[in-house]
Amino acid sequence: MRWSRCYIPTLKEAPSDAEVVSHKLLVRAGMIRKLTSGIYTFMPMGLRALNKVAAIVREEMNRAGAQEVLMPMVQPADLWQETGRWEFYGKELLRFRDRNDRDYCLGPTHEEVITDLVRGEVRSYRQLPINLYQIQTKFRDEIRPRFGLMRGREFVMKDAYSFDRDQAGCDESYKAMYTAYQRIFSRLGLRFRAVEADSGSIGGSFSHEFMVLADTGEDTLAVCTACEYAANVERAEVTGTPCTRPAAAALAEVPTPGAHTIEEVSAFLGVSADMLVKTLLFVADGEPVAALVRGDRELNEVKLKNLLGADSLELATPEQVEAWTGAPVGFAGPVGLHGVKRVFADTELEGDAGWIVGANKADTHLREVSLTRDAAIEAYADLRMITASDPCPRCGGAVELPKGIEVGHVFKLGLKYSKSMNATFLDENGKEQVMVMGCYGIGVSRVVASCIEQNNDGDGIVFPPPIAPYEVALLLLDPKNEEAAAKAAEIESFLEAEGHDVLLDDRDERPGVKFKDADLIGSPYQLVLGGKGLARGVVEAKNRRSGEKTELPVEGFAEAFRDWRAGVLKGWGL
């Protein structure tokens, strides 16, 4: 393809609302344009990258035995009401009514639709297992869409759904999809890690996230340096360590005027934060609950929500805190907490040790509080966020906390949807059984952005070869030089015959502009044809990733290019 015929509107400056590198570079490279908040148009170059990701996803899904379908984006409310998610999904579900006053939504996911489809078709165990997938546009009405394609409201997603006779079959389907995902992200040239994860609003018993490793990632991972354990910090287990502090003495009330935070109380009383207990108040499915962690720890709200089995968990408002405790925020404690009947504590707090807690009284705390003696704890559980100082829960090794971007998620759904929607089949004995489900998602458009977050430099995008809109940027420095133009056309024809996508820059622009644009759009292989080089019988080749330059002979170019390209691919691990 000739650049002069392409629509590639590159920009020198990024838009002011672009916060992350991928957003800035996707706009500057002319790959996306914003329509409205969280909604983007894919320009020709961006769509080429998106389609290349989708093609690899499609190949590996087909290879794993899944079959492609295409389901409607508009979904009727009655299906969501069957599973109960119409009420609990939240405001991310965009609801609307048609002219006949019937309720619908724009699909953020398709569990209900696919289950309705399969329950109407499958009657016998002989028809199972089934794995159906689609690559389709989704919509989630994010409250704060940001970071371009990383957290938009409209996005392209691959979602697959498996239906099996029993849990053993579901486990096999899960393994097949897990393996397919490893192949997909390896083929894309991404550095990634599969980690144990929380199932969130999708539900189910077990799940893994596939994370692209990037310092700009929104997710934090807990990765053991000694074994294979890896988990999202929301899921990461913390091994309980026995409290060795002395048993509590007599409970005592102490004034703490104006000390609302852990830091302020610690400073006022002259003690370290690990001698205090935080009492955090929440509303779980409309019911007040309290959660306790050590003062220097962070509560893991996902663990608390899972412990409660709650559909919703929200931090109590200042007004609710005062109504339940009789004190303003900052003085809540587990002793005499009459407005909250359910109190949970982290395992680290179990025992007779003396702690400092809020007194449920303004400007007052209690010392020497034993949770065993002085408070009514419903249960002790792992409720805290893992830190780098905590040991691996599997082997006791050291834990690192790298950042990652979620690009894929696989779930064992079990009977969550099939049971509520009565998706059944007749087994070998003619007995009715409920299908066991799994679901498997990949954020196709997010993969493009994540790739750029992981692969960029000061000059622009550094695309891995499988994702690049054009693998080869062929720079013709002087289009008016007939000999150079003829040689460029010859090289272009050879490369295309070899199966490479080639962008021949034949624009009437200064060489400096061409070099800058080639770096910006991120083609992994750059070839430069200039009059001086051709006079010496060479074509300059640049590895976009390493920046290394070499000269390839015009005579024998084919073999020289193949050898050079093999070296570039090796650097990518491809």
From Swiss-Prot:
<dbReference type="InterPro" id="IPR036754">
    <property type="entry name" value="YbaK/aa-tRNA-synt-asso_dom_sf"/>
</dbReference>
<dbReference type="InterPro" id="IPR002314">
    <property type="entry name" value="aa-tRNA-synt_IIb"/>
</dbReference>
<dbReference type="Pfam" id="PF00587">
    <property type="entry name" value="tRNA-synt_2b"/>
</dbReference>
<keyword id="KW-0436">Ligase</keyword>
<keyword id="KW-0030">Aminoacyl-tRNA synthetase</keyword>
<dbReference type="InterPro" id="IPR004500">
    <property type="entry name" value="Pro-tRNA-synth_IIa_bac-type"/>
</dbReference>
<dbReference type="InterPro" id="IPR004154">
    <property type="entry name" value="Anticodon-bd"/>
</dbReference>
<dbReference type="Pfam" id="PF04073">
    <property type="entry name" value="tRNA_edit"/>
</dbReference>
<comment type="function">
    <text>Catalyzes the attachment of proline to tRNA(Pro) in a two-step reaction: proline is first activated by ATP to form Pro-AMP and then transferred to the acceptor end of tRNA(Pro). As ProRS can inadvertently accommodate and process non-cognate amino acids such as alanine and cysteine, to avoid such errors it has two additional distinct editing activities against alanine. One activity is designated as 'pretransfer' editing and involves the tRNA(Pro)-independent hydrolysis of activated Ala-AMP.</text>
</comment>
<dbReference type="GO" id="GO:0006433">
    <property type="term" value="P:prolyl-tRNA aminoacylation"/>
</dbReference>
<dbReference type="InterPro" id="IPR036621">
    <property type="entry name" value="Anticodon-bd_dom_sf"/>
</dbReference>
<dbReference type="Pfam" id="PF03129">
    <property type="entry name" value="HGTP_anticodon"/>
</dbReference>
<dbReference type="InterPro" id="IPR044140">
    <property type="entry name" value="ProRS_anticodon_short"/>
</dbReference>
<comment type="similarity">
    <text>Belongs to the class-II aminoacyl-tRNA synthetase family. ProS type 1 subfamily.</text>
</comment>
<dbReference type="GO" id="GO:0005524">
    <property type="term" value="F:ATP binding"/>
</dbReference>
<dbReference type="InterPro" id="IPR045864">
    <property type="entry name" value="aa-tRNA-synth_II/BPL/LPL"/>
</dbReference>
<keyword id="KW-0963">Cytoplasm</keyword>
<comment type="subunit">
    <text>Homodimer.</text>
</comment>
<dbReference type="GO" id="GO:0005829">
    <property type="term" value="C:cytosol"/>
</dbReference>
<keyword id="KW-0648">Protein biosynthesis</keyword>
<dbReference type="InterPro" id="IPR002316">
    <property type="entry name" value="Pro-tRNA-ligase_IIa"/>
</dbReference>
<dbReference type="InterPro" id="IPR023717">
    <property type="entry name" value="Pro-tRNA-Synthase_IIa_type1"/>
</dbReference>
<protein>
    <recommendedName>
        <fullName>Proline--tRNA ligase</fullName>
        <ecNumber>6.1.1.15</ecNumber>
    </recommendedName>
</protein>
<keyword id="KW-0067">ATP-binding</keyword>
<dbReference type="GO" id="GO:0004827">
    <property type="term" value="F:proline-tRNA ligase activity"/>
</dbReference>
<dbReference type="InterPro" id="IPR006195">
    <property type="entry name" value="aa-tRNA-synth_II"/>
</dbReference>
<dbReference type="InterPro" id="IPR033730">
    <property type="entry name" value="ProRS_core_prok"/>
</dbReference>
<dbReference type="InterPro" id="IPR007214">
    <property type="entry name" value="YbaK/aa-tRNA-synth-assoc-dom"/>
</dbReference>
<dbReference type="GO" id="GO:0002161">
    <property type="term" value="F:aminoacyl-tRNA deacylase activity"/>
</dbReference>
<dbReference type="InterPro" id="IPR050062">
    <property type="entry name" value="Pro-tRNA_synthetase"/>
</dbReference>
<keyword id="KW-0547">Nucleotide-binding</keyword>
